[in-house]
Amino acid sequence: MRNWTSVALATLIGTATLSLAAVSPALADYPERPVTFIVPWPPGDLEDQLTRIIADEMTKATGQPAKVVNRPGGGAVEGSNAVATSDPDGYTVGSLVIDVVTMHMIQGNAPYKRDAFEPVGIFLTYPFALVAKKDAPYSDMAELAAYAKTGEVKLGHFGYDLIPSMATFVAAKKLGFKFSADAPFDSLDCSTLANGDADVINTTMATVLGCLDKIKVIAAYTDQPLSLFPDAKLLSQQVPGLDITLWNGFFVPKGTPQAVKDKLAAITEAAMKTQAAQDIAKATGAGVYWMNAADSAKRIAKAYTDAEALVAALKK
């Protein structure tokens, strides 16, 4: 695998380098200085782990240092705005979730506009879920709804104006219940449940790997069963119309040279085929792949429309 990856990476980088040289001698040596990848969340989750693998591959392929900077805050708005306002030269790259280019703009939370970013590509689909402790008195959305109508259920989420949070609130509305309390967290993991900070949490499987034997999945926010909990029902099966898929990709400021984006894409595509990236996919059930800029743009457009529908559903 290692030898194949080295050959594939060399081929992809060579192709991108030829493209750079054809466009501009000044860009042919990109990167000529360190590249910063901004992750607008704390360290540890899937986007952080995979971005670090990509940064390492860039360093190996180009000889230039590449680093990951975590800038959490505002449901990813703070770090994302740092990308949007950076120079369009390829030296600041955002590793951004679906909400950054959809829900935050729809809700008016973002200081940047819809055309602030250009997609390099998408490389991750999250194994996202609504999770509870194993001894919780409910195992699916119907049982949760029945319990919450008379009992207390505290929800932990990553932010009010994020797609999974909005989907959870829409699901509760359609099922006729309200959470007794809810709060946003920068990080949601085993300790959140163990400490009683929340009774159910919206999170990814990567953050609860250390307590898989102590939790249950109430609903999977995916289009396919979770590999770690294959019997868990999809949210869309339990609440028709809520077809939720959450992804992450690389974005650069508008106006970044195409040749630079091509080189970033080549490095990322090769990195997703490495053993390290595939090990993460196997361990967590994450979708690890490469979707090019054109296909990513179509996916983003659909996600924007779907996010608008979530907002409308909550206002009814």
What are the roles of these predicted feature ranges?
Residues M1-W4:
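Positively charged n-region of N-terminal signal peptides that target proteins for export
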Residues L20-A28:
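Sec/Tat signal peptide C-region and signal peptidase I cleavage site
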Residues L27-D115, G151-E152, I163-P164, A172-N202, ...:
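N-terminal (or domain-start) structured segment
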Residues E32-P34, K174-F177, A259-K316:
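An extracytoplasmic/periplasmic, membrane-proximal ligand-sensing/linker region
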Residues P42-G44, I98, K133-Y138, H157-L162, ...:
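Short coil/turn segments
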Residues A82-Y91, M105-L188, L235, T245-I280:
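Hinge/capping helix and adjacent helix->loop/strand transition within the periplasmic-binding protein
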Residues K113-F123, F179-D182, D199, A206, ...:
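Short beta-strand->loop
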